[in-house]
UniProtKB/Swiss-Prot annotation:
Catalytic activity: uridine(54) in tRNA + (6R)-5,10-methylene-5,6,7,8-tetrahydrofolate + NADH + H(+) = 5-methyluridine(54) in tRNA + (6S)-5,6,7,8-tetrahydrofolate + NAD(+); uridine(54) in tRNA + (6R)-5,10-methylene-5,6,7,8-tetrahydrofolate + NADPH + H(+) = 5-methyluridine(54) in tRNA + (6S)-5,6,7,8-tetrahydrofolate + NADP(+)
Organism field: Lactococcus lactis subsp. lactis (strain IL1403) (Streptococcus lactis)
Keyword Cytoplasm found: yes
Gene: trmFO
Cofactor(s), names only, from the UniProt record: FAD
Gene Ontology MF term list: flavin adenine dinucleotide binding; tRNA (uracil(54)-C5)-methyltransferase activity, 5,10-methylenetetrahydrofolate-dependent
Localization per Swiss-Prot or TrEMBL: Cytoplasm
Predominant place of localization: cytoplasm
The protein, known as: Methylenetetrahydrofolate--tRNA-(uracil-5-)-methyltransferase TrmFO
């Protein structure tokens, strides 16, 4: 393996952060960016870290998971967080930035570094004998996407995501639901939310009339035909959902069920199933409920489901074009390929969702690329931190149901001892523990 420099492909949020982290540790970087030579359908400029959608980096307080992640990144000298603080604009409790000023700052800080060589060209193959970070984003060029697809195997690369909402298990009303697998096959792994005929009719009407999120210009709903949105099913006919994700067959009421039901029927009229989403069973996703509804509408409509009246949504459902990998099978927590240790992946293509999360993955990949370059032990950030919980989640969740994920407190390791009921107090304790853990690892691994 050649060790004269480290390659970073893509100068978005993840790639820019990775290049900065590598260069500041004294290692030469070749940063490849095709914009300026070849444009994507999404970007408007050739600047680094261009924010193509919102100009918000979301919540600022450390009692918010993304706020905690930003504080951890700040302590690790993130160029993305530095840029955000310098170009911040008023936005209440959120961290929003001047879009052009933000990209200008990152472009200047990274490209002016004496150890960074910026090369404007399209990369169409994966380097075999050099340490390389691939951070080409959700609209990776077709040629490189095909190479990544070949490298990872036929089932290892997806071209869109259709994610169902995920809810906090502690917000489920267990008086109205029951655990059971269809036809009692295997363990009772599913939480079932039964509906009466009247409840189902009201739910279907709400779905049909709910407002959908607008599509971006580069997206085409035809790609979603193999994974139909729940609201589209509702529009296709009264019984479409009853023969799809809400079919009740094999899900009879248990004998001790005391919730509402239609007369003496042994089986509900319709059932919404919740499937465990993480090993600790603190998160559940709504099975088959991929959706394109606006987030506010998702909350309004899905809280009509019995047992979910007070559901806390850890992640709302999304449907959009998004090239991403089967990270549970393909990546290590260090963002290294399991197949080829000198190859790292970072950004949205790894299954992290959001500006800050993408930059965080680049930060971790950059640090570990340097560790590999220097023949040092790579760093695994603890699950007690936000920056450690995200790579753990995307590399340890069930591959069959893997979908891109934002950072949330639901994926951070829970506090020991009795659960603190007051949410703000609980999240404050989680944040304090995270920052203490980070201080320890910064010292231990000389970060």
């Amino acid at each position: 393996m050649k060790k004269t420099h480290i390659n970073v492909i893509g100068a978005g949020l993840a790639g820019s952060e990775a290049a900065y982290q590598i260069a500041k540790r004294g290692i030469p970087v070749k940063l490849y960016e095709m914009r300026g030579v070849k444009q994507t359908p999404q970007h408007k400029t050739d600047k680094f870290a261009e924010l193509v959608c919102s100009n918000s980096l979301r919540g600022a307080a450390i009692t918010n998971a993304v706020g905690l992640l930003k504080e951890e990144m700040r302590r690790l000298d993130s160029v993305i967080i530095k840029a955000a603080e310098v170009t911040q604009v008023p936005a209440g409790g959120a961290l929003a930035v001047d879009r052009e000023g933000f990209s200008d700052f990152v472009t200047r800080e990274v490209s002016n570094h004496p150890l960074v060589e910026v090369i404007r060209e399209e990369i169409t193959d994966l380097p075999e004998d050099e340490i390389t970070i691939i951070a080409t984003g959700p609209l990776t060029s077709d040629k490189l996407a095909e190479k990544i697809h070949e490298f990872n195997g036929a089932d290892g690369f997806y071209f869109y995501d259709a994610a169902a909402p995920i809810i906090d298990a502690n917000s489920i009303n267990f008086d109205k639901v029951y655990k059971k697998s269809r036809y009692d096959k295997g363990e009772a792994d599913y939480i079932n939310c039964p509906m009466t005929k009247e409840e189902f009719q009201a739910f279907q009407e709400a779905l049909i009339s709910a407002e959908e999120a607008p599509l971006n210009s580069f997206e085409d709903l035809k790609v979603f035909e193999g994974c139909m949105p729940i609201e589209e099913m509702a529009k296709r006919g009264y019984k479409t959902m009853l023969f799809g994700p809400m079919k009740p067959v094999g899900l009879e009421y248990p004998e001790d069920y005391k919730g509402p039901r239609d007369g003496d029927f042994k089986t509900p009229y319709a059932v919404v199933q919740l499937r465990q989403d993480n090993a600790s069973a603190s998160l559940y996703n709504i099975v088959g409920f991929q959706t394109h509804l606006k987030w506010g509408e998702q909350k309004r409509v899905f809280q009509m489901i019995p047992g979910l009246e007070n559901a806390e949504f850890v992640r709302y459902g999304v449907m959009h074009r998004n090239s991403y990998m089967d990270s549970p099978n393909l990546l290590k927590q260090t963002f290294q390929s399991r197949k080829q240790e000198n190859l790292f992946f970072a950004g949205q293509m790894t299954g992290v969702e959001g500006y800050v999360e993408s930059a965080a993955s680049g930060l971790v990949a950059g640090i570990n690329a340097v560790k590999l370059f220097n023949d040092e032990e790579v760093v695994i950030f603890p699950k007690t931190t936000a920056i450690g919980s995200l790579p753990y989640y995307i590399t340890h969740t069930d591959s069959k149901h893997f979908q891109p994920m934002n950072v949330t407190f639901g994926i951070v390791e829970e506090l020991e001892g009795p659960r603190i009921r007051d949410k703000k107090e609980r999240y404050t304790k989680v944040a304090e523990r995270a920052l203490n853990s980070l201080t320890d690892i910064i010292s231990k691994d000389n970060l």
